[in-house]
Amino acid sequence: MRYAVITRHRREFEVRLMCRVLAVSPAGYYASLTRPASWHAVVDDLLMRHVRIAHAASGETYGAPRVQQELTAAGLPVSTKRVARLMREDGLAARGKKARRVATTDSHHAEPIAPNLLARQFDVHGSAVNRVWVSDITAIPTREGLLYLATVLDLGSRRCVGWAMRDRIDLDLALSALRMARQARHPAPGLIHHSDRGSVYAALGYRAELAAHGMVASMSRKGDCYDNAVAESFFATLEFELLRKHDWPTRAEARRAIFRYIETWYNPRRRHSTLGYVSPAEYEVQLEAAA
């Protein structure tokens, strides 16, 4: 196995150096090149090619569990342990998460606060969609200034069903994301809409929009980000997989990148651990087929 590692990296590093690091003799390594490759090594080489492709396609964000799911979906059944070994040998790893949230919640207002109907009961997937939506707003830095992103996620499938971006936080930003979700999904009356206590979500105009379409407001407890953990998790994933890699000169460039991330990666393709490592779109197809 150590010989295979040397062969994979011989164009990058000196063979003698790698032999010393891996505690094998150069003579033994060169002798191994004249022997027929074992079946195990041949399969490893094939799998490694697919591991590299899956890892690169994710923007180098997938770790072994998600890469393993990609290979299995491609008809290459392999254990997570083997994928982890191959990734380790090739120097591939999911880049660690690092939070960079800018505070966007203004909870110092006199507007009414809705009760917390969700109470951290986030595990509603597997039953249906359009029963609980969670909303939040985050700030995205660009060299031109902050860009604000409002999102609406379906708790049943973790799909981002509505989103909007503006240069500032206001009622129109939050309403635009909500209206996009409503027009795309047409939920039945009784849907629970959960958010933090921010002034835009507590505003009369937002409450009126919810009431007009039969949605029931729910809000987190004061100062408790875990009460809206699903929305926070989405923003952490966005930060990890997209935002930290870029220094956008303008808001327009950031808008285009975030649009692509949500609509061409996160919703249709990104494997979600909560959903059994399928994408939100695929999970909804499974729910519909099982109904």
What are these regions (language model features)?
Residues 1-291:
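Charged DNA-binding/catalytic regions of mobile-element recombinases
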